[in-house]
């Protein structure tokens, strides 16, 4: 008899959640590759090997799919809801979201990308493991004009791309995995792979990044950085627009127009959160009640100890208003994938949301690459995030037993 594991249970419940998403189910709003890969896309999402007819300038996520404006928008005394899609604050610009792949390796002194630059300015920081159990970041910004120097850069992976696809975000990276290339081709998605040797490093399309060893004896692949100016140049050279008419938000945020907050009344306290991506890649957060931020630290295999996660540009430790830890089935892509990780988004899974020093347990779902990432409470309502920066972890189900908070 086959053993029924926790992952099996989650996959079954996740498939049910995904079917609800595909059938158009929307909970009530709250106040706050190769033949195999293309065939899998065709069977699962109705996508074949030919490119999608949608272009980079496709319509923004519709209100039924993405996080809608809060219910208060029906109040005629309030101005129209026009929130920043990543933070829920009043909209700062009409710029296109930009996601930059950032190196997070810390195995030895030579194989060490930390401390990174520019990640403290990201509105959304996504962390998930890639090959060899090493975690990687996607630093997501509301506008290319808001990006300082950032890096070290790293290659693209489809688990990050799929989170950005519904938002038509500019995905900026140097190199990419074979599955990532397949997703880009099948969905006709315009990203900026500056490692595309047949395109960049040419007179028409110069290499839009720079090298800086920072006076350290680190491997060459950990020395590449970019900046908002270089990203704008790359986009202009490639004919990619950097303006976008977003009408919804990445998560559901408390309404900035009324000053609403999710105070997590009655929720269990959670001042310290410990996340394990693999044996050597662990992330912890400690809640600061004075500024209501979760301060980030990571284990450094190179130094054999936990260290504050700081932005080298400012020297400041990273802090987030919201933390979202989501568990998913993660495994090597089949065949000779070189250990590239496949995240099972379709099945959904468990989610743990942290804000204001408390925790809320729920579920997440993402029915297809083109569907936004959604997070639900036990009663089926969409979880309400507080306005501000968010850290999102996509964690292997197998590490659930090592996850804890108190």
PLM features: residue spans?
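N-terminal, intrinsically disordered, polar/charged segments of Gram-positive cell-envelope systems
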Residues: 31-85
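N-terminal secretory signal peptides and thylakoid transit peptides that target proteins
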Residues: 1-20
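Low-complexity, intrinsically disordered regions enriched in charged/polar residues
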Residues: 30-38, 147, 317-319
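A surface/extracellular/periplasmic glyco- and lipid-processing/surface-interacting theme
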Residues: 67-124, 131-406
């Amino acid at each position: 008899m086959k053993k029924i594991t926790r992952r099996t249970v989650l996959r079954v419940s996740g498939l049910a959640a995904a079917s609800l998403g595909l059938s158009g189910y929307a909970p009530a709003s709250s106040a706050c590759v190769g033949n195999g890969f293309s065939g899998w896309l065709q069977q699962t999402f109705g996508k074949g090997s030919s490119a999608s007819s949608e272009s980079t300038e496709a319509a923004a996520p519709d209100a039924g799919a993405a996080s809608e404006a809060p219910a208060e928008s029906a109040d005629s005394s309030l101005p129209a809801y026009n929130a920043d899609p990543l933070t829920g604050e009043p909209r700062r610009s009409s710029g296109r979201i930009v996601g930059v792949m950032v190196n997070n390796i810390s195995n030895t002194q030579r194989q060490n990308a930390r401390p990174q630059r520019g990640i403290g300015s990201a509105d959304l920081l996504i962390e998930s493991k890639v090959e060899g159990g090493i975690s990687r970041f996607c630093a997501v910004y509301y506008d290319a004009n808001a990006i300082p120097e950032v890096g070290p850069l790293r290659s693209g992976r489809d688990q990050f791309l799929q989170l950005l696809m519904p938002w038509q975000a500019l995905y900026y990276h140097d190199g990419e995995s074979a599955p990532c290339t397949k997703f880009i081709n099948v969905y006709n998605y315009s990203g900026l792979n500056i490692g595309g040797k047949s395109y960049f490093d040419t007179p028409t399309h110069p290499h839009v990044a720079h090298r800086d060893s920072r006076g350290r004896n680190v491997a060459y692949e950990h020395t590449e950085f970019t900046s908002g100016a270089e990203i704008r140049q790359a986009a202009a050279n490639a004919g990619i627009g950097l303006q976008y008419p977003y009408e919804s938000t990445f998560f559901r945020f408390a309404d900035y127009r009324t000053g609403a907050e999710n105070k997590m009344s009655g929720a269990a306290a959670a001042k310290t959160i410990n996340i394990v991506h693999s044996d050597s890649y662990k992330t912890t957060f400690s809640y600061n009640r004075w500024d209501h931020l979760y301060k980030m630290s990571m284990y450094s295999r190179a130094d054999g100890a936990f260290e504050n996660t700081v932005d080298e540009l400012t020297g400041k430790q990273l802090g987030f208003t919201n933390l979202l830890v989501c568990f998913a089935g993660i495994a090597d892509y089949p065949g000779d994938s070189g250990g590239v990780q496949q995240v099972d988004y379709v099945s959904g899974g468990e989610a743990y949301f942290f804000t204001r020093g408390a925790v809320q347990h729920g579920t997440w779902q993402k029915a297809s690459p083109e569907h936004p990432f959604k997070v639900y409470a036990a009663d089926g309502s969409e979880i309400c995030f507080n306005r501000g920066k968010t850290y999102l972890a996509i964690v292997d189900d197998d590490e659930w037993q090592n996850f804890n908070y108190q």
